[in-house]
Amino acid sequence: MTTRALALRDALARLRDPGALEAFSAVAGEPLFAVELDGDPGDAAVPVALAQLAAPTVALVRDPEAPAARRFARHFDVVVASESELGCVDAAVRATPIASAVLAQLLRFGDPRTIEAGLIAESLAYSALQAGPEFRAWLAARPVSPAPRSASEAPLRVRRDGASLHLTLDRGAKRNAYSAALRDALVEALQLAASDDTIAQVVLDGAGPAFCAGGDLDEFGEAPDPATAHAIRTTRSAARLLASVRDRALVRVHGACVGAGIELAAFAGRVVAREDAWFQLPELSMGLIPGAGGTLSLPRRIGRQRTAWLALSGVRLDAATALRWRLVDAIE
C-alpha cells in the first residue's frame, strides 16, 4: 500500500477529527500523514494539530508560492516536491514506522537550549529503539561477519604541529567505521584539545578511500542493555567535545561520509569536502535514528525538514548539493 497525499480540504477535516491521533500512528491506522498544499489555506489550527500527530507529516508542495504552501509548509516534518519523492519517504516509513515516528517527534522539539540537552534526548530515543522490534529484526537478518577483529590496531592518528592538533581516522580497511575503540580514541584527543588553549586549531580527516562509513556494524547490538548503552553514549561523547571546540575545528571529508561520519563532522565550525564526498543517513533502515549527535548537528546546519528528508529517504547527497544546503562550507 502506498500513501496518497490528501487534498488540503480533506486533510483539514481529518485533523478536526478527535480520532486523528490514532488514525495516523505507527501502531494504529496509517503510519504517515501526507497533504498536498494547494488551494485555500483554510484552518489556522493546522500547525497545532500537526504537532500532535504520532506519525511523520509530509507536505507535497508542487508550487512553493501557493498560499497554502507559504502558510503551512514549515510546520510539516518533511516537504517533498513530487509524487516520486513522497513514494520514497512512504516506503521508508512503512518499512520502519516506529523509528520513523520517533525521528519525527524528536526533531519537532527544535533546537534545545544546550548541546547536552539535545544529545541526551537523542540518546534516550535511540536507546528506546535499540529495544524495539525493528532493530531486533534488522539484527536477526544481518549475517554474522567472519572477519576477526584486531585488538592492536590504532584507530586514530594524533599529531601536534605547532598550534594545530591533527586527528586522522585510521581504519582505512573498514572505511573508518566508527567503532567503540575509535570513539574512545577520538574522545581522548578532543579532551586534550578542549583542555589546552594553546591549541588554536583542531583538524579532523580520514585515511583511506572514505572519511567515515558510519557506525561499525559488527558492533551493533553488543551493548548489554539499552540503559547501559545510553549511559555510555552520554558519558563518552565525541559530539559534545567536538561542539565544545567548534570555533577551532576544521573537518575535511572525502568519499563516504555516512551516519556518524557526517553527524560528528557537522558539529565543527568549518567542514570542507572533496568533490568525491557523499553523505547519507541510513539508520532508519536499521530501525534506529541518527545516534552520534545528528539530530542536533544537522538541523543546526540544514534545518529539521532537510534532516528528516535525508534520514527518511536514505538518499545519497552529493557534495554540490551539500554545499548548496550548507551541510558543508566549501568544496576543495
Question: Which residue ranges define each predicted feature?
Answer:
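A structural preference for short, pocket-lining loop segments at secondary-structure junctions
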Residues: 20-35, 56-58, 63, 162, ...
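A generic structural signal for short coil/turn motifs at secondary-structure boundaries
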Residues: 175-178
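Crotonase-fold acyl-CoA enzyme core
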Residues: 63-93, 243-332
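Amphipathic alpha-helical segments at domain termini/boundaries
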Residues: 1-46, 52-166, 309-332
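Active-site-proximal gating segment of KS-fold condensing enzymes and close homologs
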Residues: 229-233
